[in-house]
Structure formats: structure tokens, C-alpha cells
UniProtKB/Swiss-Prot annotation:
It comes from Oryza sativa subsp. indica. SUPFAM superfamilies: Histone-fold. Its main location: nucleus. The modification N6-acetyllysine is found at residues 7, 35. GO terms for molecular function: DNA binding; protein heterodimerization activity; structural constituent of chromatin. Can be acetylated to form H2BK6ac and H2BK33ac. Keywords: Acetylation, Chromosome, DNA-binding, Isopeptide bond, Nucleosome core, Nucleus, Ubl conjugation. The gene is H2B.9. SMART domains: H2B. Transmembrane segments: none annotated. GO terms for cellular component: nucleosome; nucleus. The nucleosome is a histone octamer containing two molecules each of H2A, H2B, H3 and H4 assembled in one H3-H4 heterotetramer and two H2A-H2B heterodimers. The octamer wraps approximately 147 bp of DNA. This is Histone H2B.9.
């Protein structure tokens, strides 16, 4: 009950001169956001709010590699599980490697004055970023995956 009483004076405060000067940006932004949805398409504004709730859920579920890490783990060691903390570390590791490879491939494309990153740039960036034997295995697996993809 008390919050409702506080909300009513808050609605009156923008009408007053002094609080309006202090809280005009905050009070101004909230009605604008509320006006944008109903003003856009009347009843569909309510559906727009539902879409926003859907978008919020979409924002919460950030794309991760967790499913794929788990699938690979089960292929290699079917009887072993993984903790959520270890999964988070693995996900961060893959994101880090991905960023390094993407940055290196972008540099290579820029050096060669090419607008497109091709499999050649990716392969070269793998050789530059990953050390020794790991790079060789990654290149062979990548080549195998690309040929499988193109033949399918």
C-alpha cells in the first residue's frame, strides 16, 4: 500500500517545478519508452511488451559452446561428467581462442588487401596462433571438416 502512495506523489512531482528539474531526465525517459510501444501500434503494443519479455529471455541465454563441449566430452569419455565451473572455464577458453584466431585472420586479410576472410586465412591464423603439433592437428581436422561440409 505504501508504494502506491509513493507512486502517486512521484507522478505529481514532474508537474511541480523543482522536482521536475531534478528528475526530469528519469521521468522523461520512462513515459517516452511507455509511449513508444502503444503509440506504434495500439493493441499490438501489448504484444510488443511480450516480445520485449522474449527479448530479455534471449539476452539472458547468451550463445555458448557448452552443448558442444559436453558432446565432445561424451564422445571421448562417456563415463565422465563436468562441473558447471569447469564448463564455464572451457567456454571462456574456446571464446578466447576464437577471438585470437578471428583477430589474426582479420590481420592477414588486411595485409593482403582482401575484403573476405577465407579458409586460407583461418588456416594460416591457426598455424600462427596454436603451437607446433597442436596446429598441425587443428589444420588437419579443419581441412577434414571443410571437405565434409563442401561434399555434403
Amino acid at each position: 500500500m505504501a508504494p502506491k502512495a509513493e507512486k502517486k506523489p512521484a507522478a505529481k512531482k514532474p508537474a511541480e517545478e523543482e522536482p521536475a528539474a531534478e528528475k526530469a531526465p528519469a521521468a522523461g525517459k520512462k513515459p517516452k519508452a511507455e509511449k513508444r510501444l502503444p503509440a506504434g501500434k495500439g493493441e499490438k503494443g501489448g504484444a510488443g511488451e511480450g516480445k520485449k519479455a522474449g527479448r530479455k529471455k534471449g539476452k539472458k541465454s547468451v550463445e555458448t559452446y557448452k552443448i558442444y563441449i559436453f558432446k565432445v566430452l561424451k564422445q571421448v569419455h562417456p563415463d565422465i561428467g563436468i562441473s558447471s565451473k569447469a564448463m564455464s572455464i572451457m567456454n571462456s577458453f574456446i571464446n578466447d581462442i576464437f577471438e585470437k584466431l578471428a583477430a589474426e585472420a582479420a590481420k592477414l586479410a588486411r595485409y593482403n588487401k582482401k575484403p573476405t576472410i577465407t579458409s586460407r586465412e583461418i588456416q594460416t591464423s591457426v598455424r600462427l596462433v596454436l603451437p607446433g603439433e597442436l596446429a598441425k592437428h587443428a589444420v588437419s581436422e579443419g581441412t577434414k571438416a571443410v571437405t565434409k561440409f563442401t561434399s555434403a
